[in-house]
Design a protein with these regions (language model features):
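Short, hydrophobic beta-strand segments
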Residues: 90-96, 198-204, 251
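Secondary-structure transition/capping motifs at alpha-helix termini
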Residues: 19, 32, 120-121, 182, ...
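Catalytic-core signal marking the mid-to-C-terminal active-site face
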Residues: 224, 230-231, 254-438
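Core alpha/beta catalytic barrel or barrel-like domain that forms the active/cofactor pocket
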Residues: 125-133, 145-162, 182-202, 232-249, ...
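ATP/Mg2+-dependent ligation/transfer catalytic cores
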Residues: 1-186, 210, 348, 378-438
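Short glycine/proline-enriched loop/turn "hinge" motifs that connect secondary-structure elements
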Residues: 79-86, 124-125, 189-193, 241-242, ...
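Accessory "access/gating" subregions that flank catalytic or transport cores
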Residues: 163-168, 172-186, 200-207, 218-234, ...
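Active-site neighborhood of thiol-dependent amide/isopeptide-bond enzymes
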Residues: 204-216, 239-240
Length: 438
């Protein structure tokens, strides 16, 4: 990491949509980060996609729109290298004035879930596969990007093409360099199944830091793309005739000796793995709102479009919602494939790991793993639209065991307000509100 020095700093915390909210300060004021002096309204973490306060939010008029203070997380500050003045960014989270974690902050919600694992002497390691499109979003339309080497517009997908990687090497290399500056490490970069679509696999690490990595990767990728006069979008379904963007989450659990408790030296994995799968399966439908938080998200969850539609699990089968990859038994892990690229990683990790922990603690048996094409099977379905997803999330008892009560309330109010707002917008224009934000 480069030596951190700049004239300004940025401080920010993620709202419930995973959008950063914060301030720019002179660098001489960085010392305020250690004295609880940088304050934001608690309601800043509970605005809608349009940046508006939530009507009837308990965080606004009911409480007098109370402030909390933000303080740096355990991550080191880093330069936003793609910006001309390269300010130093300090990732933060929110606390209340009595020094308690503000559980309306999704990062605190995940930390609370991970505490349940630590109390058992376990550590969760996780990683994500981040899909995104590079697009040309100028002049009021959404088009594939211009190939920077040939100066012609892309007209087709070329999955796993090294030529695509070579042609877009400048932007991809700069994304990777900016990620290294931020302490984010890649496993690989590939071209994907959509025209102008790429996937970056991030390296496994402590689950809280892995969720940070996913969120910051999105920020970095969008920023670098704009520098190159392109838009990088994690919108779940930018083009109706192309595959959507997913955020696949992989995780394992290590005991206090560093041994993977999902492994039993065989291909099937341990009973604990199956209980974790059982919990994830049980909570999946009610958690659809977390995995598909916007109307556009449901365009991705369609058959034969590289995204799950039914609730299922399987060994080495990418049509299932949960996949258990084969390979070295000592590296046994769960891959949860439902979440779109438009999600808040902290909420996704909380939903998945909270459900897995419930499954382990209650010894919830997983159903029989499927074989073959999941799309051709009669399976229980995820919520089919945003409205039903909101209702399921709001009313399911298991959700209330996984997420803090005030976070559930705030998220439901947010999504109901967004649903009303999007109903007023012409369908042909809705993409404009997602493209740079989610």
């Amino acid at each position: 990491m480069s030596k951190v020095s700049a004239k300004t700093i940025q401080v920010a915390v993620a709202d419930l949509n995973g959008i950063l909210r914060g301030k720019i300060l002179p660098s001489k004021n960085a010392k305020k980060l250690k004295t609880k002096s940088i304050r934001l309204p608690l309601s800043a973490l509970n605005v809608d996609l349009f940046g508006e306060d939530i009507e009837n939010s308990p965080l606004v008029f009911e409480s007098g729109d109370t402030d909390g203070y933000i303080t740096p997380t355990e991550r080191k500050p880093f330069k936003l290298t793609w910006l001309e003045k390269a300010p130093v960014f300090h990732p933060c989270w929110m606390f209340t004035d009595d020094d308690k974690s503000f559980l309306g902050d999704a990062r605190h919600s995940l930390a609370k879930t991970l505490k349940g694992y630590r109390e058992k002497g376990w550590t969760v390691t996780a990683a994500t596969e981040m899909e995104f499109y590079l697009v040309n979003a100028q002049h009021g339309s959404l088009k594939p990007p211009i190939n920077p080497k040939t100066n012609t517009q892309l007209v087709r997908a070329d999955v796993l093409s090294t030529q695509d990687l070579n042609d877009f090497e400048d932007i991809l290399n700069e994304i990777q360099e900016a990620c290294i500056e931020a302490g984010i490490n890649f496993e690989s970069i590939t071209s994907e199944s959509g025209c102008g679509q790429f996937e970056v696999t991030l390296k496994h690490r402590n689950a809280l830091l892995a969720a940070d990595d996913a969120l910051l990767f999105k920020v970095i990728t969008k920023g670098v793309a704009l520098k190159h006069r392109l838009t990088a979008t994690f919108m779940a379904k930018p083009y109706l005739d192309q595959p959507g963007n997913g955020m696949h989450m992989h995780f394992s659990i290590l005991d206090n000796e560093g041994q993977n408790i999902f492994s039993n030296d065989g291909d099937a994995g341990s009973n604990i793995l199956k209980y974790a799968v059982g919990g994830c399966i049980l909570a999946m439908k009610a958690s659809t709102l977390i995995f598909a938080p916007f109307e556009n998200s449901y365009e991705r969850l369609t058959p034969k479009a590289h995204a799950p539609t039914g609730i299922s699990w399987a060994y080495e089968n990418r049509t299932a919602a949960i996949r258990i990859p084969m390979g070295n038994p000592l590296s046994k892990r769960i891959e949860h494939r439902v979440a779109g690229g438009d999600t808040n990683p902290y909420l996704v990790f909380t939903a998945v790991l909270g459900a897995a922990l419930q499954g382990i603690e209650k010894k919830i048996d997983a159903p029989k793993p499927i074989q073959g094409d999941a799309y051709s099977l009669k399976l229980p379905r995820l919520a089919q639209n945003l409205s039903s997803a909101i209702d399921l999330f709001q009313n399911e008892d298991l959700i209330k065991q996984i997420f803090p009560k005030n976070l559930v309330t705030n998220l439901v109010l947010t999504k109901k307000q967004e649903l009303k707002q999007f109903d007023k917008i012409n369908s042909a224009d809705k993409w404009k509100y997602y493209i740079n934000s989610v």
